Amino acid sequence: MALFTPWKLSSQKLGFFLVTFGFIWGMMLLHFTIQQRTQPESSSMLREQILDLSKRYIKALAEENRNVVDGPYAGVMTAYDLKKTLAVLLDNILQRIGKLESKVDNLVVNGTGTNSTNSTTAVPSLVALEKINVADIINGAQEKCVLPPMDGYPHCEGKIKWMKDMWRSDPCYADYGVDGSTCSFFIYLSEVENWCPHLPWRAKNPYEEADHNSLAEIRTDFNILYSMMKKHEEFRWMRLRIRRMADAWIQAIKSLAEKQNLEKRKRKKVLVHLGLLTKESGFKIAETAFSGGPLGELVQWSDLITSLYLLGHDIRISASLAELKEIMKKVVGNRSGCPTVGDRIVELIYIDIVGLAQFKKTLGPSWVHYQCMLRVLDSFGTEPEFNHANYAQSKGHKTPWGKWNLNPQQFYTMFPHTPDNSFLGFVVEQHLNSSDIHHINEIKRQNQSLVYGKVDSFWKNKKIYLDIIHTYMEVHATVYGSSTKNIPSYVKNHGILSGRDLQFLLRETKLFVGLGFPYEGPAPLEAIANGCAFLNPKFNPPKSSKNTDFFIGKPTLRELTSQHPYAEVFIGRPHVWTVDLNNQEEVEDAVKAILNQKIEPYMPYEFTCEGMLQRINAFIEKQDFCHGQVMWPPLSALQVKLAEPGQSCKQVCQESQLICEPSFFQHLNKDKDMLKYKVTCQSSELAKDILVPSFDPKNKHCVFQGDLLLFSCAGAHPRHQRVCPCRDFIKGQVALCKDCL
């Protein structure tokens, strides 16, 4: 074991240690001396550096947000308010500056006893002032949010009230920047859901800007459409119709492009879902199309699809639930109360009543975000009274087809019979080729009539009426089937004819004879287009769901005054003679007059290919149910009429050769609006009813509409005068006013 030897301090080692210690002590003394002498300069420089960095920091933030307008919630489509963000940052910077300056000043005062007059006394008060303002902002205080006028945005006020109560019901509202303030509600409702006017100081929505990048260009061939429709056997009848009419369609789109500017139109993403052709619907329309089944819906669908395609829009066609789910898979199951952001799957949806139920079930909660895009093909129309679920229930209506709570103008009809809806229409087909057209003009009219009724039961109890006609001319028919018990023996029955053969027969014929059924079909228009006069049976009393089984369950109380109201009202004599079948003298006088007149073929423009293209293009470009403001038709078309008690707005407008325009009701729903048209309201109230706005002339009492979905051209008030918005229309294009294009 080694012994420990104690260390002995030599004089040499001691000297080295003392020298080293002395050197270190001297350097430290020198350092503190220099530091004390330069302290005032260092504190000043430090302050300047901090302030300079702060300025540069704020400047950098400003540069990064140069395109964002200042004000509350100035960031577009974000969950953050730039002012609040900067407030927090500035608050942090000011706190640090305050602490640093306090320490520096203490060093200066305590360390040197000089420079006690440094201009720092104002800083604490400035900092305190800033802290108060910053704290106010952080705690939710906002600068005053000046809201623009809400004229033209009838839903805005109601939506704001709803947001005040319900904005916490879904976290998605906060994600869009909603924080409980009116301004945040307004920004959300103007930029995300489009119910309110856009605030002028706000930057534009980048998603809306992106949406306008792709433009529609007209198409002049059908190759892509044929390929698309070939995949479905259900489309066979429609595909054949489109092929037959292809030349006429292409000529029509070229002609329309020469007459009006079809450039700079946004190319829309369009979904077409034919619910009636799905297997789940239970209908056999596609299967019976070639064997005498109903064709009206297929005619309208094929003409709509053709129009959308030629106008240059991107269309996707669905005829099964599987296809519908595949197209909409991105949003199926989305339970958010807010719409999805970014590239839209679809922007327009054409659908039928059957498909509507399928669409709602498929989308689930997401349905609400697509309601405004819907355009529902609805032959007989849906009146507001049946569309509004609560109102329909309160009236005891049990129709399976109504209660959708859409804007009534989203329902597209076969004829312009329901002004609360939109008139889509169809094209009356010309079945002739170029050589036929040359030959058909040489055909001489014979002293013969053709009866409109291909089913034997339509002829029941009509012999006396037909006997009168037979007194003056031959009677022909196109009845199919073995049963002919109701057909008089003198009738020459041709059976089912092809479209081409039917047109040649019509060219030989002077009179097309209505039997009272079917209602509102396309055949009378084909007859008139081939130079026939149409004998149109009058209904007295008018037929409706109140007295006719055929209309029971349909979502309308519309009254038909004749077999073909469109022909009666919008065409009339000399082409259309509306008569009471039970008045033998009236029938005989009409037949004599028709035999003594010479009329040319007439086709209303709205039932031609070009007319339909023009109308659908106007609807796509102008109709907008996803934004709050109603901008079309233009207000210049408004003509106000007062209906007498017991008279509907549809009637009073029609008497003046005008159309009731439901879009204008919102401009007649306030005291000040009434004054413009010399109606003075000494008192007023709100009511949720289809018969308002109305005016009681005895008491000068006005009743205004409390529910915008109940504005209705139909319905007559028993005591008040209804205040009615009418408009003019283009002859042969009823859906459009003279200033609408």
Swiss-Prot record:
Q: Biological process GO terms, please?
A: positive regulation of cell migration; positive regulation of receptor signaling pathway via STAT; protein N-linked glycosylation; protein N-linked glycosylation via asparagine; viral protein processing
- Catalyzed reactions per annotation: N(4)-{beta-D-GlcNAc-(1->2)-[beta-D-GlcNAc-(1->4)]-alpha-D-Man-(1->3)-[beta-D-GlcNAc-(1->2)-alpha-D-Man-(1->6)]-beta-D-Man-(1->4)-beta-D-GlcNAc-(1->4)-beta-D-GlcNAc}-L-asparaginyl-[protein] + UDP-N-acetyl-alpha-D-glucosamine = N(4)-{beta-D-GlcNAc-(1->2)-[beta-D-GlcNAc-(1->4)]-alpha-D-Man-(1->3)-[beta-D-GlcNAc-(1->2)-[beta-D-GlcNAc-(1->6)]-alpha-D-Man-(1->6)]-beta-D-Man-(1->4)-beta-D-GlcNAc-(1->4)-beta-D-GlcNAc}-L-asparaginyl-[protein] + UDP + H(+)
Name the species this protein comes from: Homo sapiens (Human)
Q: Name one Pfam family in it.
A: MGT5A_N
Q: Which residues cross the membrane?
A: 14-30
Q: Where is this region: Sufficient for catalytic activity?
A: 213-741
Work out whether the entry's keyword set contains Metal-binding: no
The compartments listed are: Golgi apparatus membrane
Q: Which InterPro entries match?
A: GT18_cat, MGAT5_Glycosyltransferase, MGT5A-like_N
Q: Which residues are glycosylated?
A: 110, 115, 118, 334, 433, 447
What would changing residue 297 to A do, according to UniProt? Loss of catalytic activity
* SS bonds (residue pairs): 145-183, 156-196, 172-338, 372-626, 649-724, 653-726, 660-713, 681-702, 737-740
Got a GO cellular component term for this one? Golgi membrane
Q: Which GO terms describe its molecular function?
A: alpha-1,6-mannosylglycoprotein 6-beta-N-acetylglucosaminyltransferase activity; manganese ion binding; protein phosphatase inhibitor activity
Q: Which residues lie on this side of the membrane: Cytoplasmic?
A: 1-13
Q: What is this protein called?
A: Alpha-1,6-mannosylglycoprotein 6-beta-N-acetylglucosaminyltransferase A
Per its database record, what is this protein's job? Catalyzes the addition of N-acetylglucosamine (GlcNAc) in beta 1-6 linkage to the alpha-linked mannose of biantennary N-linked oligosaccharides. Catalyzes an important step in the biosynthesis of branched, complex-type N-glycans, such as those found on EGFR, TGFR (TGF-beta receptor) and CDH2. Via its role in the biosynthesis of complex N-glycans, plays an important role in the activation of cellular signaling pathways, reorganization of the actin cytoskeleton, cell-cell adhesion and cell migration.
Phenotype upon changing residue 31 to A: No effect on the biosynthesis of the secreted form
